[in-house]
């Protein structure tokens, strides 16, 4: 019975189009679909159905917003900015400060500095205490040569999260590097 099941599964996988499929477990090391999204083709996300992870075309509603956000965040942090923007755009709640923040991050890193800054400001208008958005906004200001504005964001992070926070340290480092 198991042999028939495996043969059926193998036949299905060979005829299921160009999307990649991954068995859960095994050598996955317990990684999440968000981490595994980079195994997919650009324009796809990883969807877990039962014990199988499958790459599917990214579109609104294909996954819960939190899962799309995590996959978009992973893509953005790994330098896949345009792909990340596709995933983030599929999120239904476009007013989530996290979504706005990583949309800003991806745009800034892709060379659209002013657009990135606009998204950080939108995120902060919703949640002024979102220190990661403040860090990224400050880094955007550094990239624009506006150290004065970056210093203001550094002060805001200090007031909200302290000088020991990663966001404070990272922005302080970016400001120091630009000032030398």
Predicted feature locations:
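Alpha-helical segment of the N-proximal tetratricopeptide repeat
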Residues: 61-94, 98, 107
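Canonical tetratricopeptide repeat
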Residues: 102, 136, 170-174
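TPR alpha-solenoid repeat register
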Residues: 99, 133, 167-168
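Residue-level recognition of tetratricopeptide repeat
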Residues: 96, 130, 164-165
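Conserved structural position within tetratricopeptide repeats
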Residues: 89-93, 124-125, 159-162
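Long, contiguous interaction/recruitment modules in multidomain scaffold/adaptor proteins
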Residues: 20-70
